[in-house]
């Protein structure tokens, strides 16, 4: 608006200068000059009123647009706040549910692991019990036996195995004592017929898991024990007179001492 007013003022000044020049040149027609002065004043007041009206209208439009923009910004902020609140609530709800699900999964895994371990322990225990029952019921005859009778039979088996081992040890020691060649353990004597008992036969005969006897009723133990029984004897080869070693053997070889305690 300021530039337009300046242009108008410049135009008016030019017009006024032209009017004064015309007045000087022409002294005639004094009435026409007075009319032009009145018209110039009217145009100036109209222009000033138009500019005031235009500035007021433009200010009103600017205030209205500013108010509208402020309302839009306020509405956006309120909507964003509400959306942010809703989003935060939803995310918190999802996080809570997810953490709950994770805790349930973890508890379930721990429970499954503990159940698996307990199941394995139960299976191992059951297998042990089945093995024991199988050992007990190897010679099961389907008879009407009580618990005491079964336990008595088991004790008889154990005692019989112990007696058998002692008898075999005693017989082996006496057989070895009778044979003089067994004092020196040479590599060639393992295949000799006079050896009688090999290590394999001794190991098989001493196996406790095989039952090689018949079940007999338990007899009362006697108060006196035979001091010369085979179970109480121990035999050592150190008391046997040494013989000359076989040819080709070293002089540093010493006779071995073998003893079989009565256990």
UniProtKB/Swiss-Prot annotation:
Location of the motif Nuclear localization signal 2: 107-114
Nuclear localization signal 1, short sequence motif: residues: 21-28
UniProt-annotated stretches for the region Disordered: 16-41, 216-263
Source organism: Arabidopsis thaliana (Mouse-ear cress)
Compositionally biased region (Basic residues): 25-38
Full protein name: Protein IQ-DOMAIN 9
Function: May be involved in cooperative interactions with calmodulins or calmodulin-like proteins. Recruits calmodulin proteins to microtubules, thus being a potential scaffold in cellular signaling and trafficking. May associate with nucleic acids and regulate gene expression at the transcriptional or post-transcriptional level.
Biased composition (Polar residues): 226-241
Keyword presence, Nucleus: yes
Annotated family: Belongs to the IQD family.
Sample GO molecular function, one term: calmodulin binding
GO cellular component: nuclear body
